[in-house]
From Swiss-Prot:
<dbReference type="InterPro" id="IPR047865">
    <property type="entry name" value="Ribosomal_uL10_bac_type"/>
</dbReference>
<dbReference type="InterPro" id="IPR043141">
    <property type="entry name" value="Ribosomal_uL10-like_sf"/>
</dbReference>
<protein>
    <recommendedName>
        <fullName>Large ribosomal subunit protein uL10</fullName>
    </recommendedName>
</protein>
<keyword id="KW-0699">rRNA-binding</keyword>
<keyword id="KW-0694">RNA-binding</keyword>
<keyword id="KW-0689">Ribosomal protein</keyword>
<keyword id="KW-0687">Ribonucleoprotein</keyword>
<dbReference type="InterPro" id="IPR001790">
    <property type="entry name" value="Ribosomal_uL10"/>
</dbReference>
<dbReference type="InterPro" id="IPR002363">
    <property type="entry name" value="Ribosomal_uL10_CS_bac"/>
</dbReference>
<comment type="subunit">
    <text>Part of the ribosomal stalk of the 50S ribosomal subunit. The N-terminus interacts with L11 and the large rRNA to form the base of the stalk. The C-terminus forms an elongated spine to which L12 dimers bind in a sequential fashion forming a multimeric L10(L12)X complex.</text>
</comment>
<dbReference type="GO" id="GO:0006412">
    <property type="term" value="P:translation"/>
</dbReference>
<dbReference type="InterPro" id="IPR022973">
    <property type="entry name" value="Ribosomal_uL10_bac"/>
</dbReference>
<dbReference type="GO" id="GO:0015934">
    <property type="term" value="C:large ribosomal subunit"/>
</dbReference>
<dbReference type="GO" id="GO:0070180">
    <property type="term" value="F:large ribosomal subunit rRNA binding"/>
</dbReference>
<dbReference type="GO" id="GO:0003735">
    <property type="term" value="F:structural constituent of ribosome"/>
</dbReference>
<dbReference type="Pfam" id="PF00466">
    <property type="entry name" value="Ribosomal_L10"/>
</dbReference>
<comment type="function">
    <text>Forms part of the ribosomal stalk, playing a central role in the interaction of the ribosome with GTP-bound translation factors.</text>
</comment>
Length: 172
């Protein structure tokens, strides 16, 4: 990579850090190419990205972003996972790390908040934005369904009383 390519890469990575909702930094020493491809594929399917960058370039790219506090995590063989949804990158990275011991989560950032490895894991346990929306819609729909059942119940009860009265008169 010559200087111009490095400048372009740093500018691109800086933009990715600024736009992302969360960033996860992990060591990937010992991961095979197939495992790394699997991680990239899972992250892409979830709406995130995985990037391996030189530590020096990643630290430069972090300057001027909210995630600048995680620059100290870039030592050794590091991989960066990021996504616009704050829950996506931590969730996919933690799930992958559970299956592959060689991916070791070092920490990350969500906006200006710097997270340690435990913080990333607890963030991964939260429901995603889509799951929260589904729960909210369910909460809104439930009272409406109950109201519909309650308003139709008296009519059904009246019909049953009239039917029972009619059967009683026929029997007599």
């Amino acid at each position: 990579m010559d200087r111009a390519e490095k400048r372009e890469f740093v500018a691109w990575l800086n933009g990715a850090f600024k736009e992302s909702g969360s960033v996860v930094v992990a060591h990937y020493t010992g991961l095979t190419v197939a495992q790394m491809s699997d991680l990239r594929s899972k992250m892409r399917d979830a709406g995130g990205s995985v990037k391996v960058a030189k530590n020096r370039l990643a630290k430069i790219a972090l300057q001027g972003t909210e995630s600048e506090g995680i620059a100290d995590l870039f030592t050794g063989q590091t991989v960066v996972a990021y996504a616009n949804d704050p829950i996506t990158a931590p969730k996919v990275a933690v799930e992958f790390a559970k299956a592959n011991d060689k991916l070791v989560i070092l920490g990350g950032a969500m906006g200006a908040t710097t997270l340690n490895a435990d913080g990333v894991k607890s963030l991964a346990s939260l429901p995603s934005l889509d799951e929260l929306r589904a729960k909210l819609v369910g909460m809104i729909q439930t009272p409406a369904q109950r109201l519909a059942v309650l308003t139709s119940a008296p009519a059904g009860q009246i019909a049953r009383v009239i039917g029972a009265h009619a059967r009683k008169n026929e029997a007599a």
